[in-house]
Amino acid sequence: MAVKIRLRRMGAKKNPFYRIVVADSRSPRDGRFIEEIGYYDPIKKPAEVKIDEAKAQDWLKKGAQLSDTAKSLFVKAGIIPGRAKTNEA
């Protein structure tokens, strides 16, 4: 079973809110998940990110893969080393 750490969309139309979850890579984006480890609210200024670092590190040690967006959030939160992606053409 390939496990991914990714975002699950919540909220209302035109007002997204994301939960950071650990899920089987074959399950749909908003479908079944194993564990919730944080949230991301892009509407607030500045955007609010809260990640349970202990749970995240535990899942990464177990071999969970990060989605691209989750990886950038983890870098910004300082959970994993690296540089935040920039939008360069």
Curated annotation (Swiss-Prot):
GO terms for molecular function: structural constituent of ribosome. Pfam families: Ribosomal_S16. GO terms for cellular component: cytoplasm; small ribosomal subunit. Signal peptide: none annotated. GO terms for biological process: translation. Keywords: Ribonucleoprotein, Ribosomal protein. Belongs to the bacterial ribosomal protein bS16 family. PANTHER family: 30S RIBOSOMAL PROTEIN S16 (PTHR12919), SMALL RIBOSOMAL SUBUNIT PROTEIN BS16M (PTHR12919:SF20). This is Small ribosomal subunit protein bS16. It comes from Desulforamulus reducens (strain ATCC BAA-1160 / DSM 100696 / MI-1) (Desulfotomaculum reducens). The gene is rpsP.
